[in-house]
Amino acid sequence: MNTRTLAISSMLFWMACSNLFRIRISDESITTVDSGTLVEQFAGDIGFGEFVSMDLTSSAELANQGVEPGDISEVFMENLELEAVSPTGGDLSFIDSVDVYVEAPDLPRVLIASQDDFPEGQALVTFTLEDVDLTDYVVSESMTFDTDVSGNRPDQSTDIAARFTVAIGVTGKGACANATGNR
């Protein structure tokens, strides 16, 4: 290999390793909202508590790419949706509004998504996302998504799937580990 080819190859490798690359992680959680008594329906107790708790830094998607917590430069929510998956033909119209927050030890609770439009007959609803960098939450010992929900319990028990996708920007070190296979 001549010097010019080596220089060009080295420059291309350096450029590839200095740029961020993104890893997308998607997950789903299913919860059941039980049908309510008349009193519960009037009280507005919807029974939709903690959303999901997770440790993204230990996810297989990151580990398989050779990425460690120190390699993460930015994390943003790309998609969040709720879907009534049971009963057949069910919808989310019993919900008035949902605010989704992220929490982690020693970090403030921050609003990351919200929705206040749950039309009758529509099983799938996508949330409006806030522009929040979740990096500090993701690299903490644990991260929790929590919800503030208003509405009434449904007429019949409803299974709701909550789906989300986060995009994780990885530093040059993580990109190089991925490119060279060094883990």
List PLM regions with ranges.
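Bacterial N-terminal signal peptides that target proteins for export
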Residues: 1-7
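Surface-exposed loop/edge segments in extracytoplasmic proteins
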Residues: 106-115
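Cysteine-clustered segments with highest specificity for TGF-beta superfamily mature ligands
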Residues: 116-167
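Post-signal-peptide N-terminal segment of Sec-exported extracytoplasmic proteins
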Residues: 37-71
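Exposed low-complexity, polar/acidic, P/S/T/G-rich flexible segments that act as propeptides
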Residues: 82, 153-183
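A short beta-strand element within beta-rich, extracytoplasmic domains
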Residues: 73-89
